[in-house]
Amino acid sequence: MASSNRRVLVNGGGPAGAVTAFWLAKGGFEVVVTERSMSRPYGQGVDVTGRASDIIKKMGLEQRIRDSTTGEAGLTVVDDQGEDVAPPLGTAPIEGGTASVTQEIEIMRRDLTKIFVDAAEALPNVTFRYGCTVDEVQQHEKSITAVLSDTGKPEDFTAIIGADGLGSAIRKLTFDPEINRRSVSPTNTYVAFFSIPGDPKYDTPVGKLQHANKGRGILVRPIDKKGTQRSCYLMSQSDSQELAQVARTGSQEDQKALLDNRFREFTGPLGKRAVEGMHSADDFYFTRIVQIKLDSWHSGRAALVGDAGYSPSPLTGQGTTLAIIGAYVLAGEMAKSPDDLERAFTSYYAILNKFVSESQEIPFGGQAPKLILPQSDWGIWLLRTFYKIISWTGIWRLLNFGNETVKVELPEYDFGGLD
């Protein structure tokens, strides 16, 4: 076993954790990745945009990722009968923005995770421990100790990285409780996502979005180029306390029952298909959309990366991009200053804080969810009319509703540990 001064624990085996592990290993650290799930079948479609694409090139993974994209060719709004109201908006390029939500690199989270995990696990100084959680953390002057659930014994590390998402255990174990409480910024947007069977008579490579009043929407998108499955999203914009309570503490059965009641009345081919698919899905997940905002991304020898430290929420489309960029910079700064982690973590924050803050801005001054999911039939008519205008005129190519327009200069690091 390596001495604790070159041994790092990364909690979370998703994209943020796997990319962090990859670059830390390249920097000469011995990395242990703990992932609480034995498997994680669920996950939404995610985008890789801007400078994150440069990082996947550095990892040698660009072609594999491109080969695994969903094949989505654009997005269209459909009427109450499920018919397109106008031609679809096409894909957006990696650099620059359009009004399309479909990015050039659109991939399911589970597929992207597997690619990143495979790359990290291929390195000799990375170990993944599945079905394992971090139960206790104790900080010391020159090390940090964690008790891991698979052994129940304390283990020493030079640092612990929380790459464990919105409900980060590392954030809860190492940051002040009041700071933790204030870090969570909830919205009134809720989403359930799951897989449903494809319908060759109706489906195309284009995502389809249908609206109903009271802030409801159903979005169905390709999962892969085969077309045998689709990803389905049931979206609600509401200040309903019932939704908030069920999202927070309800069982999966409670959540499905509430969504069944809210979405069953959808007309056309999407409503019945979505609700029936929800009940049979084995990858169902329901959540309230929140952002995480902190004034510092580290506490002692514990640091946060990705959603654990600065989730921008799916409303911005920047979560995966921030996770990849954050992982690269965090690992790079640690490799540059392995004996002065306070300096490394402070530099990590200084380099990315402005970029993260601007990337967390929800479009239209935070009003995007209300505009995208109207409360009234009149609002839906206005949205569909607007969609027709930007589709038929091609104006959508000149607009930007969520692509990466905020730029960041990434340092070049000498990852000399492994070639």
Swiss-Prot record:
Family: Belongs to the aromatic-ring hydroxylase family. KMO subfamily.
Listed Gene3D superfamilies: D-Amino Acid Oxidase, subunit A, domain 2, FAD/NAD(P)-binding domain
Cited PANTHER family: MONOOXYGENASE (PTHR46865:SF2), OXIDOREDUCTASE-RELATED (PTHR46865)
Pfam families from the UniProt entry: FAD_binding_3 (PF01494)
InterPro entries: FAD-bd (IPR002938), FAD/NAD-bd_sf (IPR036188), FAD_aromatic-hydroxylase (IPR051704)
Pathway field: Mycotoxin biosynthesis
The protein's name in its UniProt record: Monooxygenase CTB7
Gene name tied to this protein: CTB7
Keywords: FAD, Flavoprotein, Monooxygenase, Oxidoreductase
EC number(s) on file: 1.-.-.-
Main EC class the enzyme belongs to: oxidoreductase
Function: Monooxygenase; part of the gene cluster that mediates the biosynthesis of cercosporin, a light-activated, non-host-selective toxin. The perylenequinone chromophore of cercosporin absorbs light energy to attain an electronically-activated triplet state and produces active oxygen species such as the hydroxyl radical, superoxide, hydrogen peroxide or singlet oxygen upon reaction with oxygen molecules. These reactive oxygen species cause damage to various cellular components including lipids, proteins and nucleic acids.
GO molecular function, one term: FAD binding
